[in-house]
Amino acid sequence: MLRATRVISAAERGNRPVADTLILNYAQRSAQVLTATGLKGGHFEIALAQATRLRTDDALLLEDGSLVEVVAAPEPLIEARAGDVAGNVAGNIASLARLAWHLGDRHIAVQMLPNRIRTRREPGVENLLKSLGAKLALIEAPFEPEGGAYESHAHDYDHDHAHGHHHHDH
């Protein structure tokens, strides 16, 4: 079983070939430690130094130098749209913002899309959104939620300048 310890962002990866592809759901893509089987049958141990959310087209660098591509798996989601009158753009934006506020207030992971919000399917969340007047569709799709203010952005990017402070004599 090959071990992966580093994430290569989609931008950093470019067109480098991959040895295999992992199709992972949101929970798996957020795990710090995981074992998974690729589409070509490879078995991989993912052991990241810190929890990092993997996104579609990111890759994992294996100990032998090869790459394994990451793809978000479809999973059960709720897609919520504003419930205001059609054609009332300002009202729809305000209603969508209200839905987002209520979900964020409960620290629920969301994926923001034009005119709609996606979140993982849970009965309590579904009931909340219905009570707020949202139009709901139960779908199966890849879930790529927003990062959030406290999410680590660790993709092994170098940061080569100091953040020293300077003082003024006054």
Question: What are these regions, as identified by a protein language model?
Answer:
Residues 67, 135-144:
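Conserved short beta-strand edge segments in small beta-sheet-based binding/regulatory domains
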Residues 76, 114-120, 141-155:
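Short proline/glycine- and acidic-rich turn/helix-capping motifs at secondary-structure junctions
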Residues 1-18, 84-128, 132:
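Glycine- and charge-enriched low-complexity intrinsically disordered segments
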Residues 1-52:
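Intrinsically disordered, low-complexity, positively charged segments
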Residues 69-88:
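Short glycine-/aliphatic-rich beta-strand segments at the starts of folded cytosolic domains
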Residues 147-170:
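Histidine-centered metal-binding segments
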Residues 48, 54-55, 60-62:
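Short, well-ordered loop/turn sites that connect or cap secondary structure elements
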Residues 40-44, 66, 76:
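Short acidic/polar mixed-charge low-complexity motifs
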